Amino acid sequence: MAEARSKISFEDALVELEQIAEKLERQDFSLEESLKAYERGMELKKICRGILDSAEGKIEALTKDESQKTNKTGFRTESKSTSQTSSDSVLEEDLF
């Protein structure tokens, strides 16, 4: 059952979590129901956090990958002699 619950989308989990929070604030539950709702809320929070962490990791990887591509292609030089390429490297280091 927990496996099926973890397949919930971020948006659906967030909506359900907000509904639980509203009901708990209005005290629409008995104590036993409140504890079950709190437990479900914590489960939903964990699911949302996992989805957000995964998305953040993907964004960081894409950003890092794009940054590396920019660095690799941003300083390409055309065929030059070794001495000229060395002096270009020094200038690039001085600039950055």
From Swiss-Prot:
Keyword match Cytoplasm: yes
Subcellular location: Cytoplasm
Pfam families per UniProt: Exonuc_VII_S
Protein family membership: Belongs to the XseB family.
Function: Bidirectionally degrades single-stranded DNA into large acid-insoluble oligonucleotides, which are then degraded further into small acid-soluble oligonucleotides.
GO CC term, one of those recorded: exodeoxyribonuclease VII complex
Self-association state and partner proteins as the record states: Heterooligomer composed of large and small subunits.
Compositional bias segments (type: Low complexity): 80-89
Organism superkingdom: Bacteria
GO molecular function, one term: exodeoxyribonuclease VII activity
Keywords (A to Z) from UniProt: Cytoplasm, Exonuclease, Hydrolase, Nuclease
EC number: 3.1.11.6
Reaction equation(s) it catalyzes: Exonucleolytic cleavage in either 5'- to 3'- or 3'- to 5'-direction to yield nucleoside 5'-phosphates
Cytoplasm in keyword set: yes
Enzyme class of the recorded protein, top EC level: hydrolase
Chief localisation class: cytoplasm
Region Disordered, annotated ranges: 61-96
Disulfide topology: none
Biased composition (Basic and acidic residues): 61-79
UniProt name for this protein: Exodeoxyribonuclease 7 small subunit
Residues that span the membrane, as ranges: none
Listed InterPro entries: Exonuc_VII_S (IPR003761), Exonuc_VII_ssu_sf (IPR037004)
